[in-house]
Amino acid sequence: MAKVLVVYHSGTGNTKAMAQAVAEGVKEVPGVEVVLKEADQVSVSDLVNADAVAFGSPTYFSYMAGVIKAIFDKAYLSRSQLKGKPFGAFASGGGGEVKSVQSIENIAASCGLYKVCEGVAVGGMPTESDSQDCRKLGTTLAKASKK
């Protein structure tokens, strides 16, 4: 069974709500398991063992949270094992969340991961429309994980 790892950090609960919506989207695809983990609980082996990964972060100074960046720092030496693995990104914030998504996408690509969908950037608490975008991200990743 294919596995999608949803990694997130959330300070206020907004990014957690987005992560849960991404996980719901993954569950819509038969034959795919979803693993939802807070960033400080994620190891490099979690990334290597997943068939696809979603990264979610709050926005700090138009950038991803340090705990998300730390995952990439640890994973960089294992990038050969991550090469071509599908990923997607999502972020929440009170400004700069598009840049936060872009920062995740850029560093994930440098670790060899392959972007399969547009990131989701949300200002504040996700609306139903935002949650739908997150579910779509999850569904897209789930389908990509089976290839």
List each language-model region with its residue ranges:
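FMN-binding flavodoxin-like domain, especially the glycine-rich phosphate-binding loop
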Residues: A2-V4, N14-A17, A21-G31, V35-S45, ...
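Short polar catalytic/cofactor-binding loops
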Residues: H9-G13
